[in-house]
Amino acid sequence: DSTPQEGSLRLYRAGVSLFMTPSVWRGNAMKTPAGDPYVKVSAINKGDVAVGVTPFVLDATASNRFCLVGIANTDRTETVPEDFRTYDEFVVWIHQNPGVCVRNLNVIGTTKTNYEQLDGLKNPEDKPRHAAFYLTATNVPVGTTIGMQCEPAKLEASVVTSSETETLSAAVPAVPPHFDGFVRVWAVLPPSEPSWPDDARLDLDYGVEMAPSMQSHQWGIHPREVLCAADASLFNSAFRLVMVGSCGTIFKSA
C-alpha cells in the first residue's frame, strides 16, 4: 500500500516509575508551541516509521517530570485507558498496542561520587506479588558499589562490581497489596575515582510472577534464567517472570 499513512502523536510527562499506570502521566500532556496536545505524523508506506514536523515544548521549569509516554493513533482521538487493576492488564496493553512507547530515563551531570535515586513502585492488586529486581551497572569503574532497597517489599541487595558491566538481581517474596512507594537505587564510586565516567549507566528492571492462566505469561522467562537458585526457588516452576517496567540513569559530564 503506497498511500501515505497519517495519524497523530500525543506525548505525556511522567515521574520515574517502575509501573507506568495512566494516573502517573494522564494529566501531564505536552503541547506544541501553538498549544495543540498532539502533532500530526505521516509515513509514505504502511509499516514505515512515522515522522512529525511540529515539536513538543519541554519546559524544564514547569515540571520535574522528565520521563515520557507516547501514544500514536490513526486519528486525533485521545485514547488513554483507566488505571490498570492488575500487572497482567498493563503488560497486555503494552504488547497489544505498538503505538505506545515509554522512555523512563534520567540524564544527569554530577560532581558527587555517590548517587541515589528513588524509583516509583506500585502494586495495583489486592494481593501480594512475588517479584524480581535487576540492577545493571554499565561502563562503571571496577570497585563501584551498587545497591537497591525497598523495606516494605523486603528488598535489600548490594554488590561491589568486578567488571565494567555488572547485574545485581534479587527476588522478593511479596510486594505488598496496593503498595505505593519507592525503590531506592544507589551507587558509590571507589576512592580512586574522582567522578563518574561519561555514559556510565544504571538500569533498574522490575519483573513480576505470572501464572499460566494470565495472558502475559507468554512473554515471560523462567526465573532460573535470571536468578540464583535460592531466589528462583521462591517462584512456582510453572510461573514466569514478566517485565513490567524499567528506570535508567545515564551520567554525563557536567
Give the location of each predicted region.
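Extracellular/luminal regions of secreted and cell-surface proteins that mediate adhesion/ECM remodeling
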Residues: 1-254
